UniProtKB/Swiss-Prot annotation:
DNA-binding recorded as keyword: yes
GO biological process: nucleosome assembly
Origin superkingdom: Eukaryota
UniProt name for this protein: Histone H1.3
Organism of origin: Triticum aestivum
Known role: Histones H1 are necessary for the condensation of nucleosome chains into higher-order structures.
Signal peptide, first to last residue: none
Keywords annotated in UniProt: Chromosome, DNA-binding, Nucleus
Protein location: Nucleus; Chromosome
Length: 31
């Protein structure tokens, strides 16, 4: 159970990081 929760959290944070990177890249392109 614990390991499953940790992996789920890692996947969520990873997807969030990728989304943030995309937003940052888009912001740099528009500037």
């Amino acid at each position: 159970m614990v390991s499953e929760a940790i992996t789920a959290l890692k996947e969520r944070t990873g997807s969030m990081l990728t989304q943030i990177k995309k937003l940052v890249a888009a912001g740099k392109l528009t500037k």
